[in-house]
Regions:
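ATP-dependent carboxylate activation and anion-phosphoryl transfer catalytic cores
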Residues: 7-23, 48, 71-73, 104, ...
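Short secondary-structure boundary/hinge segments and terminal tails
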Residues: 38-39, 87-88, 113, 140-142, ...
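Structural detector of well-ordered beta-strand residues that form the stable sheet scaffold
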Residues: 29, 79, 101-103, 131, ...
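ATP-binding N-terminal substructure of ATP-dependent carboxylate-amine bond-forming enzymes
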Residues: 1-126, 138-146, 396
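Acidic/histidine-enriched active-site and ligand-binding environments that engage anionic O-linkages
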Residues: 146-156
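A polyampholytic, Gly/Pro-enriched intrinsically disordered region
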Residues: 122-131, 152-154
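Catalytic beta/alpha-barrel core
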Residues: 134
Length: 448
């Protein structure tokens, strides 16, 4: 087992990893930028190393600084969390070269699944249902036109190196294809340094349902049930739940088997997520695979009583998994609390938290790194907390969430708490009748 793990991240996920390491008797090293000197992960770790100024590309994305921090503290493994370098094949490779275990996917796997067109081709070989569309990357606009005609409108252009909704364009008719092709490629080039595109049939008003998997170094994989991530704004998830209100026992079995088949086909090692689009007829199609821990992993932990971070560490240390699949025994909901103003287009709201009262009680979990007096820097992602409620039924979990949101007081900055309060009262949400298009029609109402 590892003696010391460096956590190459910040915020709540860094704190989350540190807590599990402490429970396992593993020493921890925090890294931080100048802007994060007062962050809780720095205070809770056994050691802490400043790796640069506030800008991410000079600190949390600076591979040489992170490797140097690992070497001077004699860390024998690095946990990348999510975001930043968690799906960076070069970072994974450099860790290998320095004799440091990367607690995540291999560089080859990150490359293979990170290229969306390649990932889709691989899933087809594994026998996993995929959305109809191009066979790999589209080289020219002429090929793009022919593929769209063959696939049938509407279609979706997607960046092969994409993520977070960047480089994606829905095209409803052929007259709009050229503009979409040009703008998607430009956006992809700017965001990822790569303008490769592929095309899929546009699945109208789908649900986005992901399957959590774990694979070990002995060729075995298992799934830990699903998460419904359909409520999104600009392809960014806002809230998630498990089980999905749209799920049936038969569909869960099929999707779980497909995810395990995919993982074992590629000999996947570590925690990962296979994301699917599910249409109104409950047909499901492979969307992408995330080769890291997900933001929303706590709701899975809550319903199956399982520490995913601990399992990641054990698998990285060569421990075999049990190989059994896990099914949800309860219902869990997560609301992402962001430092944003929901009444002003979700504009970021960095600044100093003057007052903070955390919710509590049975079935309430709060994953956060903020506290009263903490200043939220403008340099990073705006998520400051994850509020999770768990109960025997979905109705009870919603009631718990409403109560917890009412208890949650953050002053000094704007947050998305008012949005989540209104979401929990929305008839379509209460009915479980929502798709990825839900936010297009959602209007947040002013409060007194």
């Amino acid at each position: 087992m590892f003696k010391k793990i460096l956590v190459a991240n910040r915020g709540e996920i860094a704190l989350r990893v540190i807590r599990t390491c402490k429970e396992m008797g593993i020493q921890t090293v925090a890294v931080y930028s100048n802007a994060d000197a007062e962050s809780l992960h720095v205070k809770f770790a056994d050691e802490a190393v400043c790796i640069g100024p506030a800008a991410s590309n000079e600190s949390y994305l600076k591979i040489s600084n992170i490797i140097a921090a690992a070497e001077i503290t004699n860390a024998d493994a690095i946990h990348p969390g999510y975001g930043f370098l968690s799906e960076n094949a070069r970072f994974s490779k450099i860790c290998e070269e320095h004799g440091i275990k990367f607690i995540g996917a291999s560089p080859e796997m990150i490359d293979r699944m990170g290229d969306k067109a390649n990932a889709k081709a691989t899933m087809k070989l594994a026998g996993v249902p995929c959305v109809p569309g191009s066979e790999g990357v589209i080289e020219t606009f002429k090929e793009c036109q022919l593929t769209a005609k063959k696939t049938g409108y509407p279609v979706m252009l997607k960046a092969s190196a994409g993520g977070g909704g960047k480089g994606m364009r829905a095209v409803w008719k052929k007259e709009d294809l050229k503009d979409a092709w040009d703008s998607a490629r430009q956006e992809s080039k700017a965001a990822f340094g790569n303008d490769d595109m592929y095309m899929e049939k546009l699945i109208e008003e789908p649900r986005q349902i992901e399957i959590q998997i774990i694979g070990d170094s002995h060729g075995k994989a298992c799934h830990l049930s699903e998460r419904d991530c359909s409520i999104q704004r600009r392809h960014q998830k806002l809230t998630e739940e498990v089980p999905s209100p749209f799920m049936t026992t038969a569909l869960r079995k099929k999707m779980g088997e497909a995810a395990v088949k995919a993982s074992e086909f590629i000999k996947y090692e570590g925690a990962g997520t296979v994301e699917f689009l599910v249409d109104k007829h409950r047909n499901f199609y492979f969307m992408e695979m995330n080769t890291r821990i997900q933001v929303e992993h706590p709701i899975t932990e809550q319903v199956i009583n399982f520490d995913l971070i601990r399992e990641q560490i054990l698998v990285a240390a060569g421990v075999p998994i049990l190989g059994k699949n896990y099914l949800p025994s309860m219902h869990s909901i997560e609301c992402r609390i962001n430092a944003e103003d929901p009444f002003n287009g979700f504009r970021p709201s960095p600044g100093k938290i003057t007052t903070l009262h955390s919710p509590g009680g049975h079935g309430v979990r709060l994953d956060t790194h903020v506290y009263a007096g903490y200043s939220i820097p403008p340099n990073y992602d705006s998520m400051i907390a994850k509020l999770i409620t768990t109960a025997q039924t979905r109705e009870e979990a919603i009631h718990k969430m409403k109560r917890a949101l009412d208890e949650f007081v953050i002053e000094g900055i704007k947050t998305t708490i008012p949005f989540h309060r209104q979401l929990m009262d929305h008839p379509e949400y209460i009915a479980g009748n929502y798709t990825t298009k839900f936010m297009e029609d959602f209007e947040i109402k002013p409060t007194n």
